[in-house]
């Protein structure tokens, strides 16, 4: 709250959170507004801090029967010896990914081909400021992304699916923000596969108690099984971003959607 020029007390009706990374996707802003009793447009501080923590969110998704990559968590200060490294590689064989456990935009992510590259890749991931790092199994397949937004009755609905064809080895920072990828909306896939992806996106949204607009990234592995790569509680919303492309394809007016999100946040 604040005092205006007339000396009257003013307050915010709602906070529309569009900050990527910390403090918008790790729960800090959400906790601040919760303490002030000001409504906001994402999930709760607990919800977004869970989706920001890849290891924790994957654990919950796996327990619910959703497919995710195998992963091993390394806390900052935990120095790996050769025996421990060999044990990890038995669980997660090469090639694999090393990535920050907290963070987004694919910053600090490395595709590791040899054992000698693992420790430098872990150091690279820790330089992003993350308190922990994941060694994660490599999933091979086509990548897709789908937004989930509130429908007319505020119940979540899945958007048309985007296929991502990256010019790089994976959908990294350059591919996401510098145009080094081709995006096809609506993805040219079977109705059966589209239904699986959209249903799993909605399951993840509800399981992790998301609110507002969210983007769920998938990779489809053998036998048309969609595995969840990441859940973005504050998805990109520029003209280049995936969710606005999906909204346009679905015929959803952006102004109408934002009004709906604000109204449902105030009513929550």
Residue ranges and their predicted role:
Residues 1-46, 50-52, 56, 74-87, ...:
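ATP-binding N-terminal substructure of ATP-dependent carboxylate-amine bond-forming enzymes
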Residues 113-199, 220-227:
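Phosphate-binding site of ATP-dependent enzymes
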């Amino acid at each position: 709250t604040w005092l205006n020029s007339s000396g009257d007390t003013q307050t915010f009706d709602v906070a529309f959170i569009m900050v990527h990374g910390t403090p918008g996707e790790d729960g800090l802003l959400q906790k601040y507004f919760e303490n002030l009793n000001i409504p906001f447009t994402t999930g709760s501080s607990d919800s977004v801090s869970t989706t920001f923590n890849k290891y924790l969110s994957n654990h919950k998704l796996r327990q619910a029967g959703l497919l995710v990559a195998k992963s091993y968590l390394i806390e900052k200060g935990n120095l790996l010896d050769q025996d421990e490294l060999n044990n990890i590689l038995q669980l997660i064989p090469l090639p694999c990914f090393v990535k920050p456990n907290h963070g987004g935009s694919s910053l600090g992510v490395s595709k590791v081909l040899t054992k000698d590259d693992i420790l430098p890749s872990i150091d690279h991931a820790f330089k992003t400021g993350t308190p922990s790092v994941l060694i994660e199994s490599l999933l091979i397949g086509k990548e897709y992304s789908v937004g989930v937004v509130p429908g007319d009755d505020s119940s979540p609905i899945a958007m048309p699916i985007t296929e991502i064809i990256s010019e790089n080895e994976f959908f990294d920072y350059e591919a996401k923000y510098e145009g080094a990828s081709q995006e096809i909306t609506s993805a040219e896939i079977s109705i059966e596969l589209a239904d699986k992806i959209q249903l799993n996106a909605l399951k993840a949204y509800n399981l992790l108690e998301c609110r507002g607009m969210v983007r769920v990234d998938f990779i489809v592995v053998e036998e048309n099984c969609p595995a969840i790569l990441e859940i973005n509680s504050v998805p990109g919303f520029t003209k280049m971003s995936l969710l606005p492309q999906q909204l346009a394809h679905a015929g959803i007016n952006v102004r109408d959607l934002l009004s709906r999100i604000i109204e449902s946040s105030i009513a929550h």
